[in-house]
Swiss-Prot record:
Gene3D superfamilies noted in UniProt: DNA helicase RuvA subunit, C-terminal domain, Vaccinia Virus protein VP39
Organism expressing this protein natively: Clostridium botulinum (strain Hall / ATCC 3502 / NCTC 13319 / Type A)
GO biological process: methylation; translational termination
Known EC number: 2.1.1.297
This protein's name: Release factor glutamine methyltransferase
An annotated Gene Ontology molecular function: protein-(glutamine-N5) methyltransferase activity
Amino acid sequence: MILKDLLIEGYGVLKKASIGSYQIDAQLLLGKVLKKDRLFILTNPDYHIKEEEKEKYFQLIDLRKNKMPIKYILGTTEFMGLNFNIKKGVLIPRPDTEILVETVLEEIKNKNYKQICDVCCGSGIIGITIGYTLNNTEIICYDIEDIPYNTTKENILKHNLQDRVKALKSDLLTEAIKEKRRFDLIVSNPPYIREDVIETLMDDVKKYEPFEALCGGKDGLFFYEGIIKQSLEVLNDGGTIAFEIGYDQKIQVSHILNEYGFKDVLCIKDLAGKDRVIKARKY
């Protein structure tokens, strides 16, 4: 069988399954099987496909047909121009999180912060992007779950950042408190979706992405309060705390920050004009 014919079959299966991105997904999956980039797939229609390659391709097509996210199948994703390993068990990075990273990068540069903490780090994209961009920082990425912890370690090695980025296991900031660490900036994209909203999410999210990385408790605020409360013991005076938030959580998260004595609370909107990032300072 030639590449063009196999690709057309893949298109048909995914289109029938109502996968909106059926063409690009089929191309990327074939590229994964052949270990070729998408340009090769698009410019070599007569390339001969072996039987075992065909079988492997349709195994992957079947996963996508059943709504497994394409990035889990590929095992990689891009974030702010960097490539990261991801797998089932870690949240798939969203473009919205780039607003958070851009905000904290500016904060770190403006205030000459050195000691940075990424809590609920998932695949490590926030801490690693900071470390990759700013080589005069020291970053600790915390997560309590094995898969995120190990994935973050893989991504640190992938970008050769072992000298300034570390992954450690911790329930929020518990280990940082035990070890009496101090940070200039704490950043987090914690689970923040309300429990009752999870069931309304798209199939590829609620069926495959980890519940514990999505659900922020009954009101969506559980992790914000936990991190903010613990941060008082490890965040330096004059330090900054920054979060990604849900579009409707500005008032509640601002209230928690104020309750714990944080000042200069500022909310930043995303490109769609929705509240997306909140930051505040400890005095």
